[in-house]
């Protein structure tokens, strides 16, 4: 089978199903994540809460960070590129990143166009807060989706909103008559063939993970309960009081999300989680989820 085909890239993303993908800033953190059972790591210079606090322009991480992390772990390594920044994505592909996240956490390089992801061998991850965004990203070649949530806040409310909305929109598309799908595709700004796929299959054609605000084992389990295929944890782990224990607890809660006694057990004595931010306190310009279209 030819490498870089849509089928191969989606298959690679499918392999992450049920897993936890953790943000790491150095080789040491990457080793902690792998030992805790992470299915992959996201190598970056600053976690979303630090990016939010620092302000200014957030760009692709120094390639050294990615190289250091790739040397010490055997699990896949992801890295973030700015929305629309073709060259950052090409650089990450050249460095050997296993997946690229075209991420709203970084400052967008292009406010009109996303990257043409079909043109790359490496699979892409993209954020989506509704079904229209999800299908537009898939049409551009995304092999994996995640809720946008509101990164770096430690507040799960937006990730819950996005996951519930996407699930309800899937159910709506399924309920429509076939001849109504053209108008629905137009309303969503999405390709008809992808709307038809959802109508016939009752699901997205790629995996959809939860991200943006996952801060506790219960948060991770909640997102799985709502239909997520897995979980991204950004600031939540290494901003907590005991990262090793916290990372293991998140993995356990994600894997056994219906075992509430186990979740209670792994949640004990974890120390304080990261300090959260109330979404209503954010200015419109601080809302990362509204980047991209």
Curated annotation (Swiss-Prot):
The keyword Lyase applies. SUPFAM superfamilies: Ribulose-phoshate binding barrel. Gene3D superfamilies: Aldolase class I. Pathway: Cofactor biosynthesis; pyridoxal 5'-phosphate biosynthesis. Its EC number is 4.3.3.6. Signal peptide: none annotated. D-glyceraldehyde 3-phosphate binds at residue 164. It catalyses: aldehydo-D-ribose 5-phosphate + D-glyceraldehyde 3-phosphate + L-glutamine = pyridoxal 5'-phosphate + L-glutamate + phosphate + 3 H2O + H(+). The active site is at residue 80. GO terms for biological process: amino acid metabolic process; pyridoxal phosphate biosynthetic process; pyridoxine biosynthetic process. One of its GO terms (molecular function) is pyridoxal 5'-phosphate synthase (glutamine hydrolysing) activity. CDD domains: pdxS (cd04727). Keywords: Lyase, Pyridoxal phosphate, Schiff base. It comes from the Bacteria. Pfam families: SOR_SNZ. InterPro entries: Aldolase_TIM (IPR013785), PdxS/SNZ (IPR001852), PdxS/SNZ_N (IPR033755), RibuloseP-bd_barrel (IPR011060). D-ribose 5-phosphate binds at residues 23, 152, 213, 234-235. In the presence of PdxT, forms a dodecamer of heterodimers. HAMAP family: PdxS. Catalyzes the formation of pyridoxal 5'-phosphate from ribose 5-phosphate (RBP), glyceraldehyde 3-phosphate (G3P) and ammonia. The ammonia is provided by the PdxT subunit. Can also use ribulose 5-phosphate and dihydroxyacetone phosphate as substrates, resulting from enzyme-catalyzed isomerization of RBP and G3P, respectively. Belongs to the PdxS/SNZ family. PANTHER family: PYRIDOXAL 5'-PHOSPHATE SYNTHASE SUBUNIT SNZ1-RELATED (PTHR31829:SF0). This is Pyridoxal 5'-phosphate synthase subunit PdxS. It comes from Niallia circulans (Bacillus circulans). The gene is pdxS.
